[in-house]
Amino acid sequence: MFWIFVMAKPASLSIELDSDLDRRLSEIAEGMDQPKTAIIERALRDFVELRDWQDAAIDEGLRAAEEGRVFDHDKVGEWIDSWGTPNERPMPSRD
């Protein structure tokens, strides 16, 4: 048995960078012994992954609110304000 992997053809993108950003990018790439394109691709991939994570977290928060899985804002504020005081309060419960 053998496996055949088909790699997607890379897409190309043209961007214009201001001179300061281009200089910093060149310095970073040189310091990492990587081409600038690899640094840019990693940065874009990280941005997209972070955005995906943020969108999923927002969606989960909205679902939690719709289902009533939330804490009273004032009670949470009072709890946080009590931190580090002699009368620290326990974590509030969901009502």
UniProtKB/Swiss-Prot annotation:
InterPro entries, sorted: CopG, Non-func_TypeII_TA_Antitoxin
Top-rank taxon: Bacteria
Keywords per UniProt: Toxin-antitoxin system
GO biological process, one term: regulation of DNA-templated transcription
Gene knockout outcome: No visible phenotype; its associated toxin gene (parE2, not annotated in UniProtKB) is non-functional.
Its job: Antitoxin component of a non-functional type II toxin-antitoxin (TA system). Does not neutralize the effect of any of the RelE or ParE toxins.
Alphabetized PANTHER family for the sequence: PTHR40688, RIBBON-HELIX-HELIX PROTEIN COPG DOMAIN-CONTAINING PROTEIN (PTHR40688:SF2)
This protein's name: Orphan antitoxin ParD2
Organism per entry: Caulobacter vibrioides (strain ATCC 19089 / CIP 103742 / CB 15)
Gene name in the database record: parD2
